[in-house]
Amino acid sequence: MGKEKWCYINSGQCSPAFNMALDECLLNWQSEKKMPPTIRFYEWEVPTLTVGYFQRVEKDINMDVVNEKKYGFVRRQTGGRGVLHDKELTYSVIVSEDHPNMPKTVTEAYRVISQGLLDGFKALGLEAYYAVPKTEADRENLKNPRSGVCFDAPSWYEIVVEGRKIAGSAQTRQKGVILQHGSIPLEIDLDELYDLFLFPNERVKERMKSMFSSKAVAINELTDRTFTIEQLIKAFEVGFEKGLDVELVPYELTEEQLHEVQTLAKEKYESNEWNYKK
């Protein structure tokens, strides 16, 4: 028997609303058994701040700066904290909860899916490994984030290199389907990132910023080589095929599917009601 075939979509650069709408549509189509499991890579037309499903914008985000910089802004359907998507490859994995290779628990499914990321980083020549909270205190810290910034600390089974988080991921389960998506940054501009978040005062902001450098890292900070998005795509194609033991088959959306995504993008992900919901 050959390997199981999964769909592979490389969307390229899209608008913030389109990116989130396509992930949701892929989840819906998976639930309706209209598509096999799917791996998707994408980028962003403009630098974009995404916030987690439960995040309170007025508490965490400096929207004046987001608007002043003309950045994109959209709320994800996954949890977690704020992510600035810029100079990165974003990935999503959409697979049924009852897939024979998918564990029932969120953390174990995270581990299985993230094996594709781990093998992708290894294909780039990076010594990546899983972060697993070692103590009860570490586990408690996962429940009580210190700031609204996503890369602030590793969570269960996130990928680290030299002790620093190198990929931020979030997962949701809806309609019997797992959607995991995340950010693989080539570079991180700390000043740009921290300007987008609200802090009690400048001193706290500077302290959080300096702590961040010891906890998170981007690919091009770790190597003398300067990788491109194209090289990342090739490496993570290989990584997901190896890590999940599948064959990726390129897929293009039909006109009907594209229309469905565009409609959802406009009606939901471009709406203030969704993006600024309390």
Curated annotation (Swiss-Prot):
Pathway: Protein modification; protein lipoylation via endogenous pathway; protein N(6)-(lipoyl)lysine from octanoyl-[acyl-carrier-protein]. Belongs to the octanoyltransferase LipM family. PROSITE patterns: BPL_LPL_CATALYTIC (PS51733). GO terms for biological process: lipoate biosynthetic process; protein modification process. GO terms for molecular function: lipoyl(octanoyl) transferase activity. The active site is at residue 150. Monomer. Keywords: Acyltransferase, Transferase. HAMAP family: LipM. This is Octanoyltransferase LipM.
